[in-house]
C-alpha cells in the first residue's frame, strides 16, 4: 500500500508528465505515431478496466480494429507543452533506441551521449588512473627467475645460503644472536620500568621489594630475639640445678654426720 499521493497544486504539470509517459510507452511498442487512436481502439476492443465505457465517450468512427503494430524505428517527438504560464516539465533526454531495437524509451540520459568506443576508452583511462594512484610496494617485490641449468641452480642456492659473517658450525649467526640478546634485554628493562612505579604506589597490590626486605629483617630480628631469650632461660635454669645438687649433698653430709655421731654415742654408752 502506497502512502504517497500526487500533489494537487500543479495539475497541468502532472497531466503533461502523464501524457509524456503514455507517448513514450507507445513509442516503445509501436511506431504508428498515433498513440491516442491506438489506445482508443484497444479500449473499445478490451473494454475499460473497472467498468464499461460511458455512452458519451468518443469512438474511432466505427472501426473496432486497432492499427497494426509496426516496428518502432524512431521515437516520436515530444508533445508541445500546454499554452500559458505553466511550470516547465522535465526535459526529454536522448533520441530513443536504434534501428534494430525497440525505440521510445530513452537510453538513460548522459550515457546515450557516448558511443561504444568512447566508453571503452573511458574505462581504460579510469583503470590507468587507478593504477597510478596505487602505491608501489617498498621494497619492490622480487619475482622468481627461471633456472636453465643445474650449475645456475647450485650457484643461486650457494649465494642465498652464505652467511653475512663467519660463525661456528651448528650455530646461528653471531650478529643474529647479539640482536636477540639486545632485544630481550630491552624488553626486560621495559618491564622493570613499567612495574616499578606500580609496585611502589601506596595503594598497589604488587609485592614491593622494600616491603619484602622489611619483612625479612623483622623475621630475622624476631628469630634472634627468640634465640636470645631461650639462651637466657637456659642460663638461668642451670644455677638452680647446681643449687639443688649442693643442697642434696649438704643434706646427705649432715645425715651421715648425724649417723656417725649416733654411732659414737651408742659405742660410748656400751663401753661404760
UniProtKB/Swiss-Prot annotation:
<feature type="compositionally biased region" description="Basic residues">
    <location>
        <begin position="231"/>
        <end position="246"/>
    </location>
</feature>
<keyword id="KW-0597">Phosphoprotein</keyword>
<feature type="region of interest" description="Disordered">
    <location>
        <begin position="195"/>
        <end position="272"/>
    </location>
</feature>
<feature type="compositionally biased region" description="Pro residues">
    <location>
        <begin position="78"/>
        <end position="90"/>
    </location>
</feature>
<dbReference type="InterPro" id="IPR004118">
    <property type="entry name" value="HEV_TT_vir_Orf2/Gyrovir_Vp2_N"/>
</dbReference>
<dbReference type="Pfam" id="PF05501">
    <property type="entry name" value="DUF755"/>
</dbReference>
<protein>
    <recommendedName>
        <fullName>Probable protein VP2</fullName>
    </recommendedName>
</protein>
<feature type="region of interest" description="Disordered">
    <location>
        <begin position="50"/>
        <end position="116"/>
    </location>
</feature>
<feature type="compositionally biased region" description="Basic and acidic residues">
    <location>
        <begin position="218"/>
        <end position="230"/>
    </location>
</feature>
<dbReference type="Pfam" id="PF02957">
    <property type="entry name" value="TT_ORF2-like"/>
</dbReference>
<feature type="compositionally biased region" description="Gly residues">
    <location>
        <begin position="94"/>
        <end position="108"/>
    </location>
</feature>
<feature type="compositionally biased region" description="Low complexity">
    <location>
        <begin position="249"/>
        <end position="272"/>
    </location>
</feature>
<dbReference type="InterPro" id="IPR008474">
    <property type="entry name" value="DUF755"/>
</dbReference>
